[in-house]
Structure formats: C-alpha cells, structure tokens
C-alpha cells in the first residue's frame, strides 16, 4: 500500500486525529489497513479515546421487553451534562443477542455486564454494538448466581465476580450452612488468549441480597448476609481478588430493596422502599466515610417533589460530575420517560423528558457516566 500523508505523520499525531472520530467511523478506518486496525486496537489509542470520551459522559438507558417470539434489549444514551439531554442521542436495539436480562452492571470504561435468567453472562459495548458471551458458569443443581463487574487497574483487564448460592438463601433472612462458590472470569482483549472461570476463596462466607453492586475505586461493593444472617456490605478488591467485610449501622437491615450508589465519589446506600421519599421527597442516604471507617447518615428533602414525579416511583441513581443528584424510574409502561436532576446547593429540581423510545412495556435501568470506548473492537 502506498503511504498516505496521514501515515507519514508521527504516531502521537495519528492517535490525536483518530481519537476525534465517532466509533462508527473508527470501525470503517479499521478496514483500511492492518496498520490502522492495529493502531486503533492498541492500548495507547484506547487510553486517548477514553480520555476524550470522559469529557462528555452519557446517561445510558438499558431497557428489556418480551415479544411473542423474541426478546429485545434497547440501549439508548444522551449526553448527561449541558446542553443536558438535548444532544448526542444514540440508540441500539438488539434481537436475541443477549438472554432475558436479570441484572445489568454499572458501565465501566464503556462496557457493561449482563446476566440473564438462565445465568448466561454477556459483556457488551453498546457504542460499538459488540457482544461477547462468556463461557457458561458451572453451578450446583438448584443454585443461583449473582454476578458483579469490575476493572483491574493494575493488569488493565476487566473481571466478572460470580457468587453461587443455594436457592433457599435468596432474600433477607434466608441462611444455610451449605458452602457458597466464588468464581472469577478475566475479560481480555480480543487478540489475547481466552480466559476461563477460576475458583477463588472467601473466608467470610455470605449470601448476596442486593440485585446490583457498585464498582468504585478499584473495589466491588454489594449487600450481603453472613451465614448467621448478619447484614453487611462485602468489598472485593478486583486486583488482588481479596474479600473484606464492611459493617453496617444497626439501622440498616439490608435486603434487596437497598441499592449501592456513587454519591459524590463515595459509596452510599439508599433504601428504594422508603415511603417518605416516594410521597414527600424526603430520603435518607448512608454515605461511607473510608477515613473514619463509618457510615454517615444524610437526610435530603427535595422541594416540589410530588409535582415533578406525578406519583411515579423513582430511584436515586447517583450524582453527576457537577454534584447533581439524579433520579429515574425503574420501569417504563409507555408514559413519558423522564429523569430528575436535583442541585442540593441551589435546591433546583429539573425534570427532563427522554424522547426517542417507543411506548412499549420495558424493565428499565438508568446509568450515569457511560463513555465510548474501543474495548471489544
């Protein structure tokens, strides 16, 4: 191939130019030559592309629905910072690419982890419309699985943690002396050799009680119960693959109603079953103080709450880079889809309707800080 003016540029200049392109154009560039494909798949370019994408994070909506013969999942995203929700709209609709969605992880560096009701686990890059099915995890008969997704900053790989528990242990108050199984899968780049499920040891046997976990600062967090039914939060170091127990205040009797969220960069707990929040706009949030190793309770009262939510059920999803609190519904039944942004400093509550999705019944997940990345290219 004859050298073009682009190929005569310095490598860092080539990366700078390509990093400005949307993902769909990068896919086309990879077809130009093996050299371009190698450059775009490289670690230097991946880091440069992520850095630019993080400057404009996105709100990501993941919705699933059943039709007569198919199961569909819709990925819909918009920019989450000003001009808020009015630009950058992008949508992808899958048809049987992934199993019926049971849980969806928070996005990490552009990737999500889906777990189906049949325990099928799929890694997805919605920006690239790329999927990778992980090997079927082997579980004991009658057992169920909870999966959590994290990133190892040391080795620069993603990892999926799976906790296999006996069926009778699900839900708060259910305990058993039967041993659980803990396994990890390392998600590597396409050009690297495939991985496999590896058993790991946890010295603090526990059952998972929250449907979703939280990845924050190199650690995975999720709600759990000990073998003696004591509520706690488990912390998993994604790099060292070591578990640790975080004690909870006596007021927090954690079960599947609780959610772990990112609150201004800190790990926090909220109870989605709090009736005061649903009807009065008053909710309690427990924020983890790692310096003092304790949980601090914060009570937040939001003005004009009932006028803004119209009696819909909404969950607290976390905070944006501008420290605004974000709320969104857990389900969508064809009514206007919306999100709420609340600024504690100014007490300003804003509602934004989300357009571009049809009026079908969806189970619904809303995520903050989604970015474009070249993982799975």
From Swiss-Prot:
Disulphide linkage map: none
Domain (F-box): residue spans on this chain: 3-48
Full protein name: Putative F-box protein At1g70380
Organism whose genome encodes this protein: Arabidopsis thaliana (Mouse-ear cress)
Organism ancestry: Eukaryota, Viridiplantae, Streptophyta, Embryophyta, Tracheophyta
């Amino acid at each position: 191939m004859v050298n073009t003016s682009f190929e005569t540029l310095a490598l860092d200049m080539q990366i700078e130019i390509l990093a400005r392109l949307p993902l769909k154009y990068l896919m086309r560039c990879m077809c130009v030559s093996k050299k371009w494909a190698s450059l775009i798949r490289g670690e230097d370019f991946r880091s440069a592309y992520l850095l630019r994408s993080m400057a404009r994070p996105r709100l990501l909506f993941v919705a699933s629905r059943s039709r007569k013969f198919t199961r569909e999942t819709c990925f819909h995203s918009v920019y989450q910072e000003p001009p808020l929700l009015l630009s950058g709209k992008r949508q992808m609709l899958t048809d049987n690419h992934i199993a019926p969605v049971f849980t969806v992880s928070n996005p990490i560096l552009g990737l999500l982890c889906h777990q189906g009701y049949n325990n099928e686990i799929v890694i997805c890059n919605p920006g690239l419309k790329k999927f990778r099915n992980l090997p079927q995890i082997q579980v004991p008969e009658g057992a169920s699985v909870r999966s959590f997704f994290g990133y190892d900053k040391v080795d620069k790989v993603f990892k999926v943690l799976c906790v296999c528990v006996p069926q009778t242990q699900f839900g708060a108050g259910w305990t058993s002396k039967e041993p659980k199984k803990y396994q990890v899968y390392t998600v590597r780049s396409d050009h690297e050799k495939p991985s496999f499920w590896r058993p790991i040891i946890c010295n603090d046997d526990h059952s998972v009680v929250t449907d979703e976990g939280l990845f924050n600062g190199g650690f995975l967090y999720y709600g759990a119960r000990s073998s003696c039914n004591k509520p706690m939060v488990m912390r998993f170091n994604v790099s060292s693959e070591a578990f640790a127990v975080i004690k909870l205040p006596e007021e927090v009797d954690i079960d599947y109603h609780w959610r772990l969220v990112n609150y201004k960069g800190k790990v926090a707990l909220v109870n989605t079953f709090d009736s005061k929040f649903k009807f009065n706009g008053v909710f309690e949030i427990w924020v983890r103080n790692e310096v003092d190793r304790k949980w601090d309770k914060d009570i937040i009262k939001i003005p004009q709450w009932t006028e803004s939510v119209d009696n819909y059920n909404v969950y607290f999803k976390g905070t944006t880079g501008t420290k605004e609190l974000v709320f969104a519904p857990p389900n969508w039944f064809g009514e206007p889809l919306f999100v709420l942004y609340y600024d504690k400093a100014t007490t300003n509550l804003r509602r934004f309707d989300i357009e571009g999705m049809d009026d079908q019944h969806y189970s619904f997940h809303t995520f903050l800080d989604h970015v474009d990345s070249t993982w799975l290219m």
